[in-house]
């Protein structure tokens, strides 16, 4: 557990989640949990707040805690003047661009076989980078917020997961689930197209995405799965007939706003996060088979594609999807940034590589780090 008085260090034995509508930041650790069920039980036994992150693979250790101190403020985070970041340089790609294309090509061949049950797999890659000086996670989060003011920006200490001093930082556009009282809201994203600096080309890309049979099918996998998961726990569930467009500075997304009313008011935000994670948007369809395919084919994703959030004693809380993120090493010099994309039978491997590159720019841009090539 880290402590200190320099900028931001005081909370990095805890948690920061800065959303457009509010900020939760904590310090100190009263109890740590490496398993989500234990944290959920602690809430029912009187814990006032649980914060942290769930790993991509639910079988891997989580990084959750009941903090000693917490502050929840309304409105956007407005950090003090940010110090400059040290220079960050990309060292290597895991896998290489050519290897990622080969992986996607193999997946497309597998998915094209209608005799097998797999319908979608999210393929990810990562970049390893090195910083000339130590990166402060909260300063990194502040720079990400400055670049992506509409994003959900986070910094989470991964010590409870057996990663002493390592931190997950990111700026995600996607809320996994929010629960306030009996009301549940979420806005899953699936289907992506890179932005273009020319407004006319950019608008055309958005129109092509909205009308894309491939991307709408990929999005439908996610929505149908969420409807099936939430149906048993919601007395009412409102799902629009089709997706809408949202954008970040790097990409266009297909998004569907979903709203529900819980059957049991004892179902907490953490319960819902555990129920929904990982969605087909970060894993695939069917989920269990896609998860095994990813575990066999890729390097360990750690907390990329996981979930970051909080849940209070009333059961209220918000959890975001841990995309557009990176893990920082304990000494602050090492960075591993991630990007992925959903693969279906109609996917084009080169286009999928371009999509991961566009997503990686979200995080690396916040570090003022350029992608090679």
Language-model-derived ranges and their functions:
Residues 1-62:
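A generic N-terminal leader/anchor concept
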Residues 9-26, 30, 125-217, 232-238, ...:
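An anion-binding catalytic pocket shared by soluble metabolic enzymes
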Residues 21, 68-105, 118, 125-132, ...:
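Contiguous alpha-helical scaffold segments within structured protein domains
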Residues 52, 116, 177, 224, ...:
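A residue-level signal for conserved active-site and pocket-lining positions in enzyme catalytic cores
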Residues 52, 153-156, 302-309:
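A short glycine-rich, hydrophobically flanked beta-strand micro-motif that places a catalytic Asp/Glu
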Residues 61-78, 316-329:
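Structural signature of FAD isoalloxazine-binding scaffolds in flavoprotein oxidoreductases
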Residues 119-124, 154-159, 287, 305:
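Short coil/turn segments at secondary-structure boundaries
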